[in-house]
């Protein structure tokens, strides 16, 4: 495990502008990193909030690798690098604790490295473990429950007030970023239809296209209020654009008796004072959404110790798995060395067989091969630390007893 390193910079250490500068132009830069640093394997994880390189075989060049990203890049080695990856996959290192998207991004980074051929066995093990752990953390704890963004809070609020949104129509008033964010979250939840109204009709058309909805005329707002179940208002107007009389008239025009939920996220407010007093109308503001998001985020934070326990348990398991991988590699390396010794001695013996006595040649071959084996094994054992040397000697003793 000590051969694994992680270097990076995240939203915790840098502003958005710095993170943008740290980003590699192409996610396929991972190939260049492997070649430049002579790595065994490499995975590049780039998101809005982090630029991280996970590498195998970079222990002696970790700082150089960090400098490739940013002057202030941190370096984590061995178990700390693996623990960090596990925390990332579980959403503990995200700006919004427990968010789902990061797990998809980790899997995407892993799949890309696999496609580009930059995964070695060690990275395969830790990334597969991280992805599975990320799923378990969300299934076995409540780390991802509840809305923590303004958009998802709007969905939660709408479902609290109206139940399922699948048969609901959403009206977006204003074409600004905040309104678009909230509306997109509602659309992703599967609402029946989306209407977009804006004073500049062309902007309404543009946003409607992005949302897969219908652009409507701002001066026909009352008619469209009558069609809607959820209204998201987010204009930049200096005065209210949804008036008491408009809402009353819209209710009269409705062909059904059902509530209207108006989410006013404009500053100053888009909804005239008094609308909240109309029967069958619920008015909520961005403050209500923030309260929902804050409460849910606090609940998620209480789940962190449970997730950290899962991480430590998984870390012990992956350490054992990596140790076994290391042992398999060692056995393979020893076997390769012994085969090379055998091939050299055999080549020498075959040359001698052309002129020498076969029995003597074979006897010399066996003695030379045995002597070389003993020298290789003895030298390797004597270079080990005391506790490992004693264990190796015990293993050799058992092997000789079994052979006897």
Curated annotation (Swiss-Prot):
Record-annotated active site: 48 (nucleophile)
Top-level taxon of origin: Archaea
pH dependence: Optimum pH is 8.1.
Family annotation (Gene3D superfamilies): Glutamyl tRNA-reductase dimerization domain, Glutamyl-tRNA reductase, N-terminal domain, NAD(P)-binding Rossmann-like Domain
Enzyme Commission number(s): 1.2.1.70
Residues under site feature: Important for activity: 84
Activity regulation note: Inhibited by heavy metal compounds, Zn(2+), and heme. Also competitively inhibited by glutamycin.
Keyword flag Methyltransferase: no
Binding-site list for substrate: 47-50, 94, 99-101, 105
One Gene Ontology term from the biological process aspect of the record: protoporphyrinogen IX biosynthetic process from glutamate
Assembly and binders: Homotetramer.
Record-given protein name: Glutamyl-tRNA reductase
Organism: Methanopyrus kandleri (strain AV19 / DSM 6324 / JCM 9639 / NBRC 100938)
Gene: hemA
């Amino acid at each position: 495990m000590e051969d694994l390193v992680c270097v990076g910079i995240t939203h915790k250490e840098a502003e958005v502008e710095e993170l943008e500068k740290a980003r590699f132009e192409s996610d396929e830069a991972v190939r260049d990193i492997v070649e430049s640093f002579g790595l065994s394997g490499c995975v590049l994880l780039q998101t809005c909030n982090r630029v991280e390189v996970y590498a195998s075989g970079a222990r002696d060049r970790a700082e150089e690798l960090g400098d490739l990203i940013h002057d202030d890049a941190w370096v984590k080695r061995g178990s700390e690098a693996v623990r960090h990856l596990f925390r990332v996959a579980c959403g503990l290192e995200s700006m919004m604790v427990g968010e789902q998207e990061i797990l998809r991004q980790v899997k995407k980074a892993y799949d890309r490295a696999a496609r580009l051929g930059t995964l070695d066995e060690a990275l395969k093990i830790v990334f597969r473990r991280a992805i599975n752990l990320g799923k378990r953390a969300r299934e076995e704890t409540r780390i991802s429950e509840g809305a923590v963004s303004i958009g998802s809070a709007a969905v939660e609020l709408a479902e609290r007030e109206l139940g399922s949104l699948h048969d609901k129509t959403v009206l977006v008033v204003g074409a600004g970023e905040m309104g678009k964010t909230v509306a997109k979250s509602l659309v992703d939840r599967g609402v029946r239809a989306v209407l977009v109204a804006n004073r500049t009709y062309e902007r309404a058309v543009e946003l409607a296209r992005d949302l897969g909805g219908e652009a409507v005329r701002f001066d026909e707002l009352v008619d469209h209020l009558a069609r809607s179940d959820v209204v998201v208002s987010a204009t930049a107007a200096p005065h209210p654009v949804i008036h008491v009389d408009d809402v009353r008239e819209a209710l009269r025009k409705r062909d059904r008796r059902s509530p209207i939920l108006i989410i006013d996220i404009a500053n100053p407010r888009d909804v005239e004072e008094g609308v909240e007093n109309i029967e069958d109308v619920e008015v909520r503001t961005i403050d209500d959404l923030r309260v929902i998001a804050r409460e849910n985020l606090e609940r998620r934070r209480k789940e962190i110790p449970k997730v950290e326990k899962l991480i430590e348990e998984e870390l012990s398991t992956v350490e054992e798995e990596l140790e076994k991988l290391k042992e398999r590699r060692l056995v393979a390396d020893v076997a390769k060395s012994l085969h090379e010794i055998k091939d050299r001695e055999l080549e020498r013996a075959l040359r001698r067989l052309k002129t020498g006595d076969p029995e003597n040649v074979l006897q010399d071959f066996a003695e030379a091969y045995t002597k070389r084996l003993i020298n290789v094994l003895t030298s390797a054992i004597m270079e080990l630390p005391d506790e490992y040397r004693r264990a190796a000697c015990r293993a050799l003793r058992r092997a000789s007893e079994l052979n006897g």
